[in-house]
């Protein structure tokens, strides 16, 4: 039940887009069609499911003050927390590179549709932000970190697919010239963010 609560909270209450507005660059740039948005959302979800648990282990057994005591008691005073950003980003970049090669090999059409935004997942602030949130919340085990990564990824996927579906409908609507494109997308994102705030009233 604890894992389920964490998952629901990660998807709806602490949604990376609607609660923290992380990953907005690719969210706005790629969300022109549902198909492409779903592909990028699944890619982001995969990266989060892999990187958050891996970064949890790195944080627990390498970065935290005294984390190296499992190697030798003499290393209990070593603090490598200053390497957090470097190592987290390195892990994310490595996973994204592997994912990029897999997508290019098996689904070239999706690879072409995503374009530059696929390798840019490595610097997507939602990916790094999720690992930093994991570190801040002091999860008790790697399972919680994995569930948090999965929930955050699905929440991001839900957000980008929702905005893409709305933007597809907007093509047939009379949007004022000054709001066409990114302008109306920002307004819709804000309205959906307000709607998602309703989930904050749910005690989980």
Regions found by a protein language model. Name each.
Residues 5, 140-204:
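C-terminal transmembrane helix-loop-helix hairpin of multi-pass membrane proteins
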Residues 1-4, 60-82, 131-146, 201-203:
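Helix-coil boundary and interhelical linker segments in multi-pass alpha-helical membrane proteins
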Residues 21-29, 100-106, 117-118, 125-139:
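Generic transmembrane alpha-helix signature in multi-pass membrane proteins
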Residues 36-46, 86-88, 110-121, 176-184:
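Cytoplasmic-side transmembrane-helix entry/capping segments in multi-pass membrane proteins
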Residues 22-36, 96-110, 163-174:
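C-terminal ends of transmembrane helices
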Residues 60-114:
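Ordered, amphipathic secondary-structure segments that act as subunit-interaction surfaces
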Residues 5-18, 78-92, 147-159:
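Structural signature of hydrophobic alpha-helical transmembrane segments
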Residues 22, 26, 44, 49-50, ...:
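Hydrophobic core segments of alpha-helical transmembrane domains in multi-pass membrane transport
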């Amino acid at each position: 039940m604890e894992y389920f609560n964490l998952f629901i909270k990660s998807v709806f209450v602490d949604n990376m887009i609607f609660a923290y507005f992380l990953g907005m660059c690719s969210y706005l740039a790629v969300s022109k069609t549902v198909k492409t948005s779903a592909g990028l959302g699944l890619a982001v979800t995969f990266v989060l499911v892999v990187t958050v648990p891996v970064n949890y282990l790195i944080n627990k057994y390498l970065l935290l003050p005294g984390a190296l005591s499992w190697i030798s008691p003499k290393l209990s005073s070593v603090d490598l927390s200053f390497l957090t950003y470097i190592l987290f980003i390195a892990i994310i970049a490595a996973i994204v590179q592997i994912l990029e090669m897999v997508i290019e090999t098996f689904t070239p059409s999706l690879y072409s549709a995503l374009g530059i935004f696929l390798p840019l997942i490595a610097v997507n602030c939602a990916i790094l932000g999720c690992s930093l949130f994991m570190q801040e919340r002091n999860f008790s085990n790697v399972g919680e970190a994995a569930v948090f990564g999965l929930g955050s990824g699905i929440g991001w996927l839900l957000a980008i697919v929702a905005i893409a579906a709305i933007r597809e409908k907007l093509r047939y609507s009379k949007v004022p010239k000054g709001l066409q494109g990114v302008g109306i997308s920002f307004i819709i994102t804000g309205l959906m963010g307000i709607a998602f705030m309703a989930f904050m009233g749910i005690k989980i």
